[in-house]
Amino acid sequence: MSDHEEESHGASPTSPASSGASSPLAPISPRSEGNAPESPSGDVQDIYKDESFEAPASPARDSSAPASPSAASPAGSRSPSPSPVKTKSKVMIDSDEDSDAEESANKRALIDSDASDAEGKKRRVMLDSDDSDHEGTSKKEPTTKNLFGDDSDDDDEDRPKKTNDLDEFVEGRDEEESQETSKPAYDSDDDDGPVDRHGRHFEWDFDKMLAEKKAERKKKTRRGGKDGGIDIINDDDGTVSRLVERMKHAAKSDRNANIERKPAFQKIKMLPEVKAIMLRAGIVEVLIENGFMSALSEWLAPLPDKCLPALDIRITVLKLLHNPRFWKLDRSTLKQSGLGKAVMMLYKHPNETKENKGIANKLIGEWARPIYHLDTDYSTVSRQEREERDYSRMPEKRKKKINSRDEEEPNDDDQPKRPRIRDADEMGPTKSDDLKPGDKGYIPRARVPKPSTKDYVIRPEWRVTGAFKGEKKSTGNNRYDQTFRDFQERTKKSKANRIVKVSLEGRNMGI
């Protein structure tokens, strides 16, 4: 390497005189080809090896060696470089620590390598790849002060050009972050609802239904129960109260129509709805509390012209009331609502049907059992209690006969007499039973049947063996079978007529 090249590579510009600061470091001798740089101090050598390097000469030169670190000249002196070269020392200082470490390691590898001129050109291309073509001739070498952050006026002018790539990188990062924040987070757990790909919020039908149910639960109020507890008003209270108002309005409309001699059909129209609400399970208490029984008594009450309501209404209501769920209506409810009085009126009304009278009688008997403290479970009733009950329902004539027989029998034990039902064999023959069928002088005649006054409380045992297969289909001849048999008979007759009759005279012979 020539002396001119050594001088050109060894000289490094100092900071401008305007800065007024001098570098405390001693200049470093230029590095010759194949020799390590010599410095008076080992610390200074380490600093330059880690933090800065001098870029190779401009591409116009044919042969050049790797650049040696520039040494700071004494204060007040500045030696210009024949070919200014752009470096990245300021970009390295302003960048992050991670990028500084990576770039400094790459630069040390380029400085310390002993490569040929061709390799030097490749390194120049790698170092100058971030610069434009027109910036190659206006580059400056860094000084010692620039390495430690002392900026001159010239450096301030060149800062936008040197940090162009870094600014673009930072702006790109900002744009990516803004795009990420603007995108909807589909996988986020904090989303209130589902979001479609266009960013529009929508709500499923199932979510709407759950929201409505939740709103209904919030509207529920609490009240004091009969037993002192707290009962929650269910959803049926509003429905039943509105139904009761409509039932009363329908009954009033029918009464007005009856007065005006017009057809009354408002209650008939509401009958299916009333039937549906009475068939629901667990709704008896709600019906009682909302005055349903009083509205029902208005439906069963006679019209102003003393005629009974429609037959369909009477049959449906009585059958629904004869359900065990309505047997436990207390006395106060029946008296306050007037339902007991309405059912008793139907039982005693002469125009009421026999079936409805029977249902009304049973219903009144069930409602009267708690009043007389009677048990509804017949399995717990003893034999003596059943006999006493049968005796109480026995006709007066038969009671007299039983009492007359008991008086004739001596009572040795001096026990209190009690009514006892005897069998037919124990009772002596009467005038009507002197002669039996088959006896001499017995006159067969018709007898008026009398209803039995006994209560059959013991269910007979089932003695039928085998499963019931249901009613068998009739095996009678249908129309198809009869037609088929007629056809077969006609064909038989036709076949018999086809038989050739032999003639003695030889007639009708196909010879």
UniProtKB/Swiss-Prot annotation:
UniProt subcellular location: Nucleus
UniProt-listed Pfam families: Med26
Keyword Nucleus: yes
Top-rank lineage group of the source organism: Eukaryota
Record GO cellular component, one term: nucleus
Gene Ontology biological-process entries: poly(A)+ mRNA export from nucleus
Region annotated Disordered, chain positions: 1-200, 382-454
Keyword annotations: Nucleus
Biased composition (Acidic residues): 94-103, 166-179
InterPro entries, sorted: RNAPII_TF_IWS1, TFIIS/LEDGF_dom_sf, TFIIS_N
Keyword Nucleus among record annotations: yes
Chief location category: nucleus
Residue ranges annotated for the TFIIS N-terminal domain, each copy included: 294-374
Biased composition (Basic and acidic residues): 134-143, 383-395, 414-425
Regions of compositional bias (Low complexity) in chain numbering: 11-30, 55-86
Similarity comment: family membership: Belongs to the IWS1 family.
UniProt-recorded name of the protein: IWS1-like protein
Organism: Caenorhabditis elegans
